[in-house]
Amino acid sequence: MSSFDPSLSTSGMRPPLASATAPSMADSLPSINFGFEELRSRMAQFTAQFDAFIERGRKQVLEERNQFKIGLAELQEDERMRQRDIEILNLKSQTHEQTLQKEAAEAAEMHAAVSSVTLERDSRLTKRDRLKQQIEETQKAINQKLEAQRSHSRYLDAQARLNVPELEFWQDYLCLRIEGAGREDRLKFVYSHLLEKDWEAEAWFELGTSSRDYEVFHSRPKLDREYLDRELDILNEDRDFGAFLKRMRRLFIEALK
């Protein structure tokens, strides 16, 4: 710091006082709008829409699952009835076989009745075969319906994962992409451009959405559980999903350093 020079304090060296109407240096600075309010608004809007999307998807999956269970119960009841028919048929068949044996023992004395009994037996065997064929066809139809239900459930799961509104903003803002995790109640969030020395390095975590409170099941690189639980507690309390994604990105950056 330079020392004070008394000669510079004389009125002759003092610059004239600034006019009251002269513009200040602060007035001449450019106005900067950082857009924090807009960003906060968009983050809140995204969080609300994301929660609504998760809730709608959960309700839809639960509704389809309930419908599937109802349909499955009906099919199982049909199968049970068919099984009972089979048991009745087997019982009738056993009774019939006993009748045939008795009639065969009397064949010498009742040769004339053998033809009639044989025809009756053949008729019943034909009827039994026809019933067996009907049972097989019914079982095949049940299996087809079950497969159709499973296929429909898989289709709904795929649609729910693909229908992700308002995520382009976060993908661009946080270098983030969202993928399916192989289950209907999980999403996989993948970050990139985390380190300046290696922009291709990626980090990800799987988020469970089956209940109101979110849960992280897996992450790579592995994050400290205490830090994860702290972030999840904040998210489940304030429901600010955008802020949670930003905090998770910071955790991965620290883990990769």
From Swiss-Prot:
GO cellular component, as recorded: Ndc80 complex; nucleus
Sequence ranges of Polar residues compositional bias: 1-12
One Pfam entry name: Spindle_Spc25
Coiled-coil regions, chain positions: 58-151
Cited Gene3D superfamilies: Chromosome segregation protein Spc25 (3.30.457.50)
Disordered: annotated segments: 1-24
Record key words, sorted: Cell cycle, Cell division, Centromere, Chromosome, Coiled coil, Kinetochore, Mitosis, Nucleus
Gene Ontology terms: biological process: cell division; chromosome segregation
Subcellular location: Nucleus; Chromosome, Centromere, Kinetochore
Cited function: Acts as a component of the essential kinetochore-associated NDC80 complex, which is required for chromosome segregation and spindle checkpoint activity.
Family, per entry: Belongs to the SPC25 family.
Subunit: Component of the NDC80 complex, which consists of ndc80, nuf2, spc24 and spc25.
Name listed for the protein in its UniProt record: Probable kinetochore protein spc25
Organism per entry: Emericella nidulans (strain FGSC A4 / ATCC 38163 / CBS 112.46 / NRRL 194 / M139) (Aspergillus nidulans)
Gene: spc25
